[in-house]
Every structure is written in C-alpha cells, then in structure tokens.
C-alpha cells in the first residue's frame, strides 16, 4: 500500500526553490510559447526562472513550473 498524502504547502522542503530543477519548463511548451505583446519568440533564462522577450524588453516569471504570460506580471528589462 502506498502513502497518497500530499506534502504540506507550509513545509519549506515541499516547495521548490526558484530556478531549481523542479521549476524547469517543458521544452515542448517553450517551442510554442510567444510573447503576448509582440508575438515574438522567448528565451528561457533558467538561472532567473524567467522567459525573456528581448523585443518587448520584458521578463515573464515562471512560478511552480508555470510561465506567467501576463504583461502586468512581467519584469521590465533594463535598456
């Protein structure tokens, strides 16, 4: 019999750290995602845990392995 309990969200060991292997994005998803502002391709910055749109100058965060593709959630890149 297996234990089907889920880890507690309050348990720090159960939450992946930013940029950790558990927060990587599926490469197939990266192939189809585009910047919602420019419709241009994105560059995956694994160290920062972000998808970069150079044309728009925006960095979209990745939270819990899910890209947040909302311009209002993106970080403006320095010029």
Swiss-Prot record:
It holds the Pfam family Trm112p. InterPro entries: Trm112-like (IPR005651). SUPFAM superfamilies: Trm112p-like (SSF158997). One of its GO terms (cellular component) is cytosol. Residues 1-22 are annotated as: Disordered. Belongs to the UPF0434 family. PANTHER family: PROTEIN PREY, MITOCHONDRIAL (PTHR33505:SF4), ZGC:162634 (PTHR33505). This is UPF0434 protein GbCGDNIH1_0252. It comes from Granulibacter bethesdensis (strain ATCC BAA-1260 / CGDNIH1).
